[in-house]
Amino acid sequence: MLEKFSPENIKNYTKSQLNVLCDELRVTIYDTVMRCGGHLASNLGSVESTVALFYVFDFPNDKIIFDVGHQCYPYKLLSGRYARFGTLRQAGGISGFPKRTESEYDAYDTGHAGTSVSAALGLAKARDLKGENRNVIAYIGDGSFNNGLVYEALSSLKILNTKILIILNDNGMSISPTVGGMYDIINQIKESGASESIRLLESFGLTYLGVKNGNDLEEMLSAMQEAKDLLQNGSVLLHIATKKGKGYEFSEDHPTGTHGVPPVGSPKDKEYSEVLGEGLCALAKEDKSITVVSAAMKEALGLSDFFRDYPERAFDVGICEENASVLCASMAAGGLKPYYAIYSTFLQRAFDEIIHDVCAQDMPVTFCIDRAGISGADGETHQGVFDLSYLSLIPNLTIAVPKDTEELRAMLTFSATYAHPLAIRYPRAGRVLFGGENKPIKVGEWEYLHKSAKKSAKKLAVLATGERCLIIAMKILKNMQEQGLDFDVINARFVKPLDMQFIKDTDATHIVTLEDNVANGGFGQAVSMAFMQANKGCIVKNYAYRDEFIPQGGVAALQCEYGVNCKEIEEYVKSVLS
């Protein structure tokens, strides 16, 4: 049935056929995610509501914005993308998130939490001003409903004088279980129909509708039609209680573990997050001032043990990255030593607070930045390739990049007594242990991983930041040594400050910089400027990502395609040394 499905015909389906359609959606989503990886549990829980949306509304004339996008797989399958769904999250394939360039059914690109209500308001005002006739819908989970941007948008609802439908898909989870006072209000309504809480929501200018079982198709069809009818008179909040992982027993029992699922058979590398969790627990055992803050991602960031062992010093503030940054700054002002663990792509949401609250006050906050660099299959909205650039411009902030998981341990030890803002950034997986000098970390001090003994008129040094770039450097070194050529490899573990002693002392005539970051404002440009100001006369060649948003795909392939191409770098090194 799903293979031949057409949105135009769904209104002719019987209830029995619609239930079969729901079953087929779940099977297709499960099979595809097992093969390609992706977000499983959230999508399994949103099947009935999505079928009801297609049955009641008229897409693509009506517009829907999926907040984050973790619930959009059923929508993609019902909007003409079944045949290509097997390419989910692959290079050139179907995106795991809504994408306007992919289909006319996708009204607005998403990937980060809290944007859907604002986006729906904007589309609704465009409709009103152009005199168009269409419904505009924001589909948002209870985890995202904690985000402050949602309440900025709700505060604008009456001012903008427009009509939207907000579907609140309440499964009690973001990645982790949903936390916070706002969720307590939502949960009171779900559990007991608390009238005072309903009035609070309606004070924004919304008519409230509740659905006890959002995975009951009959109930969803009726509620969706009622919401559509009410929408003619003003904005509506349709609150549906669903089960994350619905229809797959293991996922229902383990919603956090099946939130994001790798392809079956994927190699299991040790993750930096595991080392972060172990390291922070060890530090906290010795230092009672150490605290940890997470924005709704404690499991993914390796913090479960810390939250278990030190609950009084562990704080999950929900999807509220700005609040988390100010909380850390003020904890530091009160004499604590806060660590804020967060994905690179989400840290950029708190840019102002990093400047204004943490760094301008020179607070000893440590940012533990996971998924830095190209993240791969989640595409443009999740690549962590900007942090070196936007953090490098901030005074008082030190930026460190460990070469491997063991150096992350050493950097955490260093951070415990560091009295200034510090950012430590690293990718997801740690595959290699490089060895090295095994000395205590010193601010701004780099490390030779290999020092050439060759004497020649031309001497080259590769300055590489982080594990991925050092892997490339060491691979090229091996190939060059097999051809009788040699060069220095430097673990540039501090991006800010640079190792000015190295820059002063090096006898290299050619410098190559490698970074898992965009070129603009990044490590390479800083190195080029430093050598120019030192009047060294070196030729500096930068390898970083060009000025484009990087789509989904494999990490190594994307590195090569967008500016850190191992073959190209090797050819340049050989041309210098030959």
What spans do the regions from the language model cover?
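Cofactor-/ligand-binding subdomain signature composed of acidic, glycine-rich
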Residues: 1-32, 200, 250-264, 575
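Glycine-rich ThDP/TPP pyrophosphate-binding loop and its adjacent helix/strand module
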Residues: 106-265, 269, 273-274, 278, ...
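Glycine/charged-rich beta-loop-alpha catalytic/anionic-binding loops adjacent to active sites
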Residues: 27-34, 95-109, 132-137, 305-317, ...
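Peripheral docking tails and interdomain loops at the edges
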Residues: 268, 376-378, 397-398, 525-578
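Cofactor-binding active-site loop characterized by glycine-rich and histidine/acidic residues
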Residues: 21-22, 39-160, 290, 295, ...
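A glycine-rich helix N-cap at a beta->alpha junction
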Residues: 84-94, 159-171, 359-371
